[in-house]
Amino acid sequence: MISAADIFCLVVGVLGLGIGALRTVFRDRFGAIYPTILAYSLGLAVLVRSPGIGDIVLDDALYHLTGKHNLPDLLGHLLTFVAMGAALGFFSRALGYRHRLWRTYGVIAVLMAVIVALFLDSPAPDVRTENIVQIDGLRAYAAMFSFALIITHIFGLVISRHGRMAVGWAPEIIALYAGTCGGIAMAAHRLLAVGFPQFYDWGYSPITWCLSLVCIGGYVTAVWVMSVTQARENSGPGGIADKGAHGVLERAH
């Protein structure tokens, strides 16, 4: 039986992949590559983490190919960082954040490598489950994943602060703060559940889902508002086509 979570993941996943495909086909019109990567990675991450498609269908398929369980969970976790990296790149460019992000991307890449190593060294590949965080012996993996999420969202918080100082409390800045703070709260809640297993009995999944929706909704809304603003400025005389890529920042001057 298809659950509500499966329907939600299917709708959001297909929507993300569809938006990514449209941006790829009409790339000359949209220009920026970061939202395209964000759409693809977020859509795939939601699909592979869905209870029915990811934990059952895809897990069985990958198990027959590789002999390892829970690869969809690992893939979904890694795609989360790809989506975050794309979002950070877009926000830094749109808000005129002058510091290069290669150090940030390097830190994220190292954290992803550690996560993969901890997964392969854990019992997760040999045990089929719907939530790998609950597997005995996987606390190190769960803790590292949550810690990596917090670090990544803190990078987003730094860019959010830069944007607030540049343009004030504009709608996209409010949405960006909602995304970063929601992400930090979600990761902190996951980290608490690792240290205190009783959190699983106190509505862990609903709380995690709600905080995840706040995080995703905030980031997606910020990207959408900034993209619309840039498109409007680019279509008019003296827009970002003439002034440069930092369309959102132009409003502060």
Label the model's feature ranges.
Residues M1-G31, F145-H162, V220-V225:
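First transmembrane helix
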Residues R27-S41, H99-V107, A166-L176, T208:
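Membrane-interfacial loop-to-transmembrane alpha-helix junctions, especially the N-terminal start
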Residues S92-S122:
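The cytoplasmic-loop to transmembrane-helix boundary for the fourth helix
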Residues P125-I159:
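Extracellular-loop-to-transmembrane junctions of the mid-late helices
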Residues Y34-D59, I173-A193:
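Hydrophobic alpha-helical transmembrane segments of multi-pass membrane proteins
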Residues A148-H253:
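C-terminal transmembrane-bundle signature of multipass membrane proteins
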Residues G54-D60, L120-I132, H189-Q198:
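Juxtamembrane "helix-exit" motif on the non-cytosolic side of transmembrane helices
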Residues S3-V14, P35-V48, D60-R93:
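Individual alpha-helical transmembrane segments in multi-pass integral membrane proteins
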